[in-house]
């Protein structure tokens, strides 16, 4: 309620008056994040962030308490609201980071402070504020500056070149369907009528699993999830069992049938 140009507030509430509400919110999230010494997965990329996040939750939540971004909360406002959910019970955090122009990733990185980084892909989404895909990719990679490990598609020439130029100190788990020397080699991908069979080699061990999808985007998202699960030492038999039960994720712009 406003009286004489002033907002009346409840006397029982506490308020902070700050010069910049967004920066204050982000600083609070940074401070809150610093309280937790747990693995945190930071996911960025032009597409697939939410699906990878939700599938990782399906794959990993049976073994640990996970805090993750709600829906597609990956913006300058969404990320601090997501990070604020961290609690003493949390054993793993999974947060998305989305940008639309140069210079935005630094603030998201300071709030998320990921220990595990996943770059899903690089495409034309939000390209209008970037001079090139390479510039966009380099900006996204700043999220991983202090990560222990970075996961990406080693067959993507643009991403591989940008990772090499970025001088990241993190261990790399680059998966590949063509290069047997990559840390995670995808030896075979076989599409059936309603599922896909994927065989892989990791740490000189060969395994196979199925996913209930046949589209290329789902296969790519699955391989990013696979790399994260392997890094977190999820047993191969559990990966096989849980991959087969992956469920589709409702996304933005989904067409709903009217009633």
Language model feature labels by segment:
Residues 11-17:
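Short, structured beta-strand-loop surface elements
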Residues 17, 23-170, 229-232, 258:
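Phosphate-binding loop of NTP-binding sites
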Residues 1-3:
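Extracellular/luminal Protease-associated
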